[in-house]
Structure formats: C-alpha cells, structure tokens
C-alpha cells in the first residue's frame, strides 16, 4: 500500500523540474518575440523615412591593406623624377572650374579670379593590384609623389586656400592615373584697351604652363568640357558683364626651350549705366544750361558772364572726375572726346557773349547822325514834308513797323573792321544796307548773334551726338 504513495510522491518530485524547464522555455520565447514586436513598431513609425534610403553593401577594406598599398607604392619611389622620364613626354590633362571673377581693377589693369584647378596624368610607378579601385588621399600625400610644376604666367599674385585645411585633393587609381586639384585665388594681369571707354570690351587671359619642363618633357592638353563656370550672378564684376570664354593652346619659344602654354580668355563687356549717370547726363545738361544765356538780354552783363563762367568751371570739374576711374593713358578715350566737345560748346557760348558785348559796347554812330550833331542848323531845319496817307490802316502799320526797324538798324550800324583781310571777307551792315555789297563777302549782323546761336548751337550739338553714338555703338 505504501508503494503507490512513493511513486506518486516520486512523480511529483520528478515533475517539478520538468515544469520549471517548460516555464523557462516560454519566458525565453516571449523575450525573443518582444524585440521583434518593438522593432516592428519602430519600423512602422519610421517607414516613410527609411523608404527613401538606398542601402549599398560595400566590402569592408581593412585599414592595414591601404597602409600596405601606400607603403609598397612609396618604397623606392623618387618624387624628383617625372613619369616616363627618358621615354616619352608626360601628358597632363587640365581642367578648371571658375568659382568667381572680379572685381576688375582698370587702374592697375588686373582682375581677380577664384578657381578650382585640376591636373590628371599617368604614373606607372603608382600602379597597384587590389580590390580597391581608387585611393582617396588628403594633402599630406601630395609632397610624397611627383607633381607638375605648373605656374600661371600672367599672375601678379596667387594664394592657395589653407582654411581649415589645405584645399588640395589627391586621387590615385589602380592603373596609375593621378588626379590632383587645388583651389587658388589669382590676381592676373589684363591689358585693357581703353580707346572705346566706356563702351569697351575686353578679353582677359589666364595663362599657365610648366615652369621648367619644355614640350619635350611635358605636354598639356585640355579635357573635354575643360572649363566650367559657376552661377555668374554671384560674381563681383560691378561695371562689367560676363559674355563668354574660350580656351587655346599654343607654343611659346624662349631661350630655355619651347613651352606649351594653355590660355583661357574671359570676355567681358563694360556696363555704361554708371558712366551715363555720372558723366554723360551731367555734361549734356551743362551744355544745355549754357544755351540759356542766348535768351538773356545782352545788356545783363553780370547774369550772362556768371552763367558762362559757372558752366565752364563745372565742365572742368566733371572732366577731372571722369578721369579718376581711368589709368593715365596717353591716348584719347571715347569719354575724353565727349567731355572735350562739351567743354568746347560751353566755352564757345561764353566767347559768343564776349564777342557780342564787345561790338555792342563799342559801336559808332552812323554818318548821318554825325553830320547832324556837327551842324546844329541841319538839326533845327530838318523836317519831313507833310504827306497825306490814303492807304489802308494795315499798310500804314506795316510802313510804320518798317520805319521802326530801319531806325533800329541805323542804331546798330557798325563801322567796318580795320584791316584788308577783314574787309575782303566781311562787310558791315551799314555798307551792305546801302548797297555797298561786294562779291565774296559775308553779311553778318552782330546784333543778331544771339538769334544765330539759338539755332546753331543746339543743331551742332545734336549732330555731334548722332555721329558720336552711332560711331561707337554700331561701327
């Protein structure tokens, strides 16, 4: 009877470890499923974010492999010798990315340019066998391999960028191809031809070549799409507009050898807005202002004199200001021509009044009036016979007006100028009025000089502007 109890007790004893094992398995199963549920929820929350990513699996390259490759490449490498020395010239492909151009300094005849300059060549000593296609290296590796001695021939000043680290990049492919790029800011020389200033156009060059290797050692070639530019709206050209660019290759012969010279020409066209506002419009207005004196009474000496002198001095100031933005060139520019002609017009207006005032203030009375003044009897007994006017009133008015004009002409009668040369070409109004006209003489009425000037000066100035602008803008 006791046996069953023992077995039952034994079964209960042996069932306890089995139950605990099952519970442990269930707990482990739940714990293994809980991260999956959490990750599923997290994936649901960031489903949109992860859907836009593309994951690329790349073989992990041990750092030691790159170090071994570099050590093997530099072992026995002489960076003082160019590739293929004594076999063939080293071919260097060049390209350029123009970050910005400007400003252009017309006085010093130079311009500033910021570029990324790249050079590519093959060096068989740098070939390596590895699963790595390219070694992307920083500037510390630049001094350990051979680099072309390229320099910019027309640079006055050149700076490499060093912040925050030297802006240089080096790439080495497993087939021995080397790419070397760096960022430079260059102040390059540009000989400006200012004959058409400020309507001038220029081609500013940027030249580079090898400093010590002639074309038997190094040959430069442009890559396809070798020169690219950034957004020109951010360039600091100010007075200029960027028109385009072109690149050329030429050979320059010197005493030390023939060198391959690569040149990029940047075509610039000057904007006229600044000079139109600062020079052309003020000069034109000053010339027009000088014509006001032609409508002022000739007896108003202070008014006309002060107006003429003021306009002349103003033109002198404008011409001086216009020259400050130019180098001291020995030839006449388009702006110099315009300012000089405007000065001549203003000065001529002042001279016109001086001439008029001289003859008016020094006029002599006519011969009939001199006789009357000398003989009082003629003044006393001189009278006009009474006449009966039977003509219409309008005719009488015309006759009276003619008589009045005749008296004014007599009042402004002048003696002829002295000298045979003057008498050969001119006759005074009094002689011409009485019929003393000679062939080849010019009839000039000094009293009407202002009337002549009102027509001559504006007409001549308009013709000058027409010829000036057509010649410089379209021819």
Curated annotation (Swiss-Prot):
InterPro entries: GABAA/Glycine_rcpt, GABBAg2_rcpt, GABRG-1/4, Neur_chan_lig-bd, Neur_chan_lig-bd_sf, Neur_channel, Neuro-gated_channel_TM_sf, Neuro_actylchol_rec. Palmitoylated by ZDHHC3/GODZ; required for the accumulation of GABA(A) receptors at the postsynaptic membrane of inhibitory GABAergic synapses. Heteropentamer, formed by a combination of alpha (GABRA1-6), beta (GABRB1-3), gamma (GABRG1-3), delta (GABRD), epsilon (GABRE), rho (GABRR1-3), pi (GABRP) and theta (GABRQ) chains, each subunit exhibiting distinct physiological and pharmacological properties. Interacts with GABARAP. Interacts with KIF21B. Identified in a complex of 720 kDa composed of LHFPL4, NLGN2, GABRA1, GABRB2, GABRG2 and GABRB3. Interacts with LHFPL4. Interacts with SHISA7; interaction leads to the regulation of GABA(A) receptor trafficking, channel deactivation kinetics and pharmacology. Glycans are attached at residues 52, 129, 247. The keyword Amino-acid biosynthesis does not apply. Allosterically activated by benzodiazepines. Activated by pentobarbital. Inhibited by the antagonist bicuculline. Inhibited by zinc ions. Potentiated by histamine. Gamma subunit of the heteropentameric ligand-gated chloride channel gated by gamma-aminobutyric acid (GABA), a major inhibitory neurotransmitter in the brain. GABA-gated chloride channels, also named GABA(A) receptors (GABAAR), consist of five subunits arranged around a central pore and contain GABA active binding site(s) located at the alpha and beta subunit interface(s). When activated by GABA, GABAARs selectively allow the flow of chloride anions across the cell membrane down their electrochemical gradient. Disulfide bonds join 190-204. This is Gamma-aminobutyric acid receptor subunit gamma-2. The extracellular domain contributes to synaptic contact formation. The modification Phosphoserine is found at residue 382. It comes from Bos taurus. The gene is GABRG2. One of its GO terms (cellular component) is cytoplasmic vesicle membrane. Its main location: membrane. Residues 1-39 form the signal peptide. It catalyses: chloride(in) = chloride(out). It is found in: Postsynaptic cell membrane; Cell membrane; Cell projection, Dendrite; Cytoplasmic vesicle membrane.
């Amino acid at each position: 009877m006791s046996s069953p109890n023992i077995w039952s007790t034994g079964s209960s004893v042996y069932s306890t470890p089995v139950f605990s094992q099952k519970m442990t398995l269930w707990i482990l199963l739940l714990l293994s499923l809980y991260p999956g549920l959490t990750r599923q929820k997290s994936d649901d929350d960031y489903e949109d974010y992860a859907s836009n990513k593309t994951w690329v699996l790349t073989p992990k390259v041990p750092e030691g492999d790159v170090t071994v490759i570099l050590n093997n490449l530099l072992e026995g490498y002489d960076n003082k010798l160019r590739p293929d020395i004594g076999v063939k010239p080293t071919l260097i492909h060049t390209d350029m990315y123009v970050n910005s151009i400007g400003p252009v300094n017309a006085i010093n005849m130079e311009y500033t340019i910021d570029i990324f300059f790249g050079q590519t060549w093959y060096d068989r000593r740098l070939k390596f066998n590895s699963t790595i296609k390219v070694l992307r290296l920083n500037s510390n590796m630049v001094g350990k391999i051979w680099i072309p001695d390229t320099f910019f021939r027309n640079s006055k000043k050149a700076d490499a960028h060093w912040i925050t680290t030297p802006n240089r990049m080096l790439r080495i492919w497993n087939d021995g191809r080397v790419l070397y790029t760096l960022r430079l800011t260059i102040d390059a020389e540009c000989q400006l031809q200012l004959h058409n200033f400020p309507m001038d156009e220029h081609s500013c060059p940027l030249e580079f070549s090898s400093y010590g290797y002639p074309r038997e050692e190094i040959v430069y070639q442009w890559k396809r799409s070798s020169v690219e530019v950034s957004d020109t709206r951010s360039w600091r050209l100010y007075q200029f507009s960027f028109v385009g660019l072109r690149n050329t290759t030429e050979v320059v012969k010197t005493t030390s050898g023939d060198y391959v010279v690569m040149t990029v020409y940047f075509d610039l066209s000057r904007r006229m807005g600044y000079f139109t506002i600062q020079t052309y419009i003020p000069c034109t207005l000053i010339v027009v202002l000088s014509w006001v004196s032609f409508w002022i009474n000739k007896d108003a000496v202070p008014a006309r004199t002060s107006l003429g002198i003021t306009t002349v001095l103003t033109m002198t100031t404008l011409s001086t200001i216009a020259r400050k933005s130019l180098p001291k060139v020995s030839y006449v520019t388009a702006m110099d021509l315009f300012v000089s002609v405007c000065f001549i017009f203003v000065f001529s207006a002042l001279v016109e009044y001086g001439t008029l005032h001289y003859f008016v203030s020094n006029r002599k009375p006519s011969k009939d009036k001199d006789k009357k003044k000398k003989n009082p009897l003629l003044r006393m007994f001189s009278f006009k016979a009474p006449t009966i006017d039977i003509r219409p009133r309008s005719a009488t008015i015309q006759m009276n007006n003619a008589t009045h004009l005749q008296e004014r002409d007599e009042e402004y009668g002048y003696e002829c100028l002295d000298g045979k040369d003057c008498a050969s070409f001119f006759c005074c109004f009094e002689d011409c009025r009485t019929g003393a006209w000679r062939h080849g003489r010019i009839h000039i009425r000094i009293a009407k000089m202002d009337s002549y000037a009102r027509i001559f000066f504006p007409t001549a100035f308009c013709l000058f502007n027409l010829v000036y602008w057509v010649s410089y803008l379209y021819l």
